[in-house]
Every structure is written in C-alpha cells, then in structure tokens.
Amino acid sequence: MLRIADKTFDSHLFTGTGKFASSQLMMEAIRASGSQLVTLAMKRVNLRQHNDAILEPLIAAGVTLLPNTSGVKTAEEAIFAAHLAREALGTNWLKLEIHPDARWLLPDPIETLKAAETLVQQGFVVLPYCGADPVLCKRLEEVGCAAVMPLGAPIGSNQGLETRAMLEIIIQQATVPVVVDAGIGVPSHAAQALEMGADAVLVNTAIAVADDPVNMAKAFRLAVDAGLLARQSGPGSRSHFAHATSPLTGFLEASA
C-alpha cells in the first residue's frame, strides 16, 4: 500500500496520457497497467467541458487525476496553470513541471522550488518533477511537497536509470515517497527502481509508443510488482568474491 498525502494506492505504477494513438487505446493500456493515478497535461484537455476525449473516460474509470503543468517555463506560469486545473477539475493535486528548454525538457530547479513553496502554502498537494539532485529533493520535501519525482533520464528518452547513484541517495534520505519519473524505457527499468527503494514509478512513453501498448502496460504492472516483492523479500548482499552454495569437499572427505 502506498500513501501520498491523503490518498492510498494499491498500485505502485503511475501512468500518463500522452502519445497514445487514440483515447480508447490509452484507456485499455491504463486498465491493463492497474494504475490508480494518471497524469494529464492541462494543455491537452478541454477544461471547459468534461466530455473531452481524454478527460471523460478517465473520470468514468475512477482513477485519481494528477494534472501537470507541462509547457510552462516559470514559477508564475506554473502557479497560474495550477489554479486553472484546480478550478476545472476540482482537485488540489498537482504534478509540478517546469522545463524552459524544449529540446532537453530538463526541469528548472530554481523555478520549481519557488513554485512548490507557494503552491503548498496555497493548499495544493504538490508532486514536483525534478532533477535527480539529493539537495533539491530535500529542499522540496522541506517546503511541504507530498512526494518528489526525480528523473531517471530525460523525458521520453527510454534510457532507464541513468541517474541511479543520485536516486539511491534521494531514496535513502527521503521521508516522503519517491516516484521515479521520466526515462524509464522497459519494464526491467521499473523493476530496478522498485528494488532499489523507490516507492513508485511514472511511465508514459514506454507504454504509449510500444507496438502493443496494452501488453506493455501489463508487463510494467508485473515488473513493478516483482520489483516491490523482491525488495520486501530482502535480497542477499553483493560480494566481490564467490561463495559456494554447497560444501566443496565434504563428500570427498566422507568417502576417504
């Protein structure tokens, strides 16, 4: 069971809504993933009416909606977008996302921290997308963010856990949930994140652009469950040396 702020989730896999060939395929994949929290970019939905092709089926499915501020470049723009989302969707949950460079889509740490502090004070449940910076993640936690979402690699790159060393530090020091977001490309990446101690992963591109998004979503669901179960089972320690699993000479001595 995963708790973030006032909500609990059975699934440790969060999903997105971008890049799917159709809203029907999107919903089939989300159902197959078992995800109970789904992000959506405010720039992609019609906030004036709930019969939007993306929004309507998500509301009907009963998943927790996590609007994100993708596309904004400053703290001020993010705060404005957050209030629009809260008014339109009736949720104070927000994935804070500020990336001014459209080529790399890397989060701006200064603007993110500034916006996070203000939004928390204004009653939002803030989940910030951020770089895998242990110092920044601790600062975001200190200003009241409900979780931190450090990247594994650049958004949509499918490179996996390129920031593993920093993620390990973030996980070790965090007192709020850590959700690895961005760069996860295959189910084994997700399993590794859960094994190393992450509380959840957010996956969008790897599922949406797969040849078979529905089966890929199932694969991610199984991988996340496997990674979590492996961690809870207490993996053996690593060693530079070999350790025999059975006596090497006992049977020889016994027969001598």
Curated annotation (Swiss-Prot):
Record GO cellular component, one term: cytoplasm
Active-site positions on this chain: 95
Reaction catalyzed: [ThiS sulfur-carrier protein]-C-terminal-Gly-aminoethanethioate + 2-iminoacetate + 1-deoxy-D-xylulose 5-phosphate = [ThiS sulfur-carrier protein]-C-terminal Gly-Gly + 2-[(2R,5Z)-2-carboxy-4-methylthiazol-5(2H)-ylidene]ethyl phosphate + 2 H2O + H(+)
Record-listed 1-deoxy-D-xylulose 5-phosphate binding positions: 156, 182-183, 204-205
Superkingdom field: Bacteria
A GO BP entry: thiamine diphosphate biosynthetic process
GO molecular function, one term: thiazole synthase activity
EC number: 2.8.1.10
This protein's UniProt keywords: Cytoplasm, Schiff base, Thiamine biosynthesis, Transferase
Pathway membership, UniProt: Cofactor biosynthesis; thiamine diphosphate biosynthesis
Primary location recorded for the protein, binned into one broad class: cytoplasm
Gene3D superfamilies the UniProt entry points to: Aldolase class I
Subcellular location: Cytoplasm
UniProt subunit comment: Homotetramer. Forms heterodimers with either ThiH or ThiS.
Family, per entry: Belongs to the ThiG family.
Record function comment: Catalyzes the rearrangement of 1-deoxy-D-xylulose 5-phosphate (DXP) to produce the thiazole phosphate moiety of thiamine. Sulfur is provided by the thiocarboxylate moiety of the carrier protein ThiS. In vitro, sulfur can be provided by H(2)S.
Protein name, as recorded: Thiazole synthase
Biological source species: Escherichia coli O7:K1 (strain IAI39 / ExPEC)
Gene that encodes it: thiG
